[in-house]
Amino acid sequence: MSKKFNQIVFIGRFQPVHNAHVAIMRRALELADKVIIVIGSANQPRSVKNPFNVDEREMMIRQAWYKISIPTHLEIVSVEDNVYNDQAWAVAVQEAVTPLLTGEKTGIIGHKKDETSFYLSMFPQWTFIEQEEVEPLHAATIREHYFTKGTNVNFLKGVVPDSTFDFLSRFHGGPEYEYIVGEKEFIDNYKKQFAMLPYPPVFVTADAVVIQSGHVLMVTRRSRPGKGQLAFPGGFLKNKADKDGGPDRSMVDCMLRE
């Protein structure tokens, strides 16, 4: 008996893969011959929000999939974020997916849980399939507990597939894990400084884009957040600094000489 769709597209960040993701995969496979999974936020540096790289997430997806169906029914692609241009991001998704399409019946599946799910409406050429909430389970909650120092990873057993649990158990305590825990602790402590204020503070920062002889000036961050990552030179503006002036020119000149 033929299925309703030739393929169904499932977009997510999968940070990490959890039981609700698996439930959506199962539903998609009931409705289509093939499932195309789009991994978002590709090539992001490790952070509390994006702790796992594309290869790690693809591995989690494939290992969970093996419990559901055969590999030939699954295609996986990845796309980078385009923070300031949703349309450019949508084009990138379509360019990644289109070569994999067979037949005319394509669906896109997901759960519209909040305003962050707006992307599900950006592909009118694909039939939207609403997935009801399986359980009140969010990857952000999993990350919050998992990357808290001293957490017993056994709490994950009830919310992620066995293969994801095995991966997270191996990842736990490693250098990448400790880096993210340190980032989380820094951010949490930073926010605590202002928790009792009647209004949230507004900080103004500015970075410089310096081009010299066809090269763009970059620095390596020496402190958290983002310690060890590349960045444009800049930072907080002084209280009386002109916001249009941006970073101190002498600072940039010094960096160029070095």
Where are these regions (language model features)?
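A short, flexible beta-alpha/helix-coil linker loop
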Residues: 41-45, 224-225, 237-239
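Short glycine-enriched, charge-decorated loop/helix-capping segments at active-site entrances
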Residues: 48-52, 233-238
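Nucleotidyltransferase catalytic core that binds NTPs
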Residues: 1-193
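N-terminal strand-loop-strand
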Residues: 192-232, 241, 245, 252
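Short strand->helix junction
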Residues: 14-15, 237-239, 244
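Generic secondary-structure boundary/loop-capping signal
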Residues: 134, 139, 227-229, 234
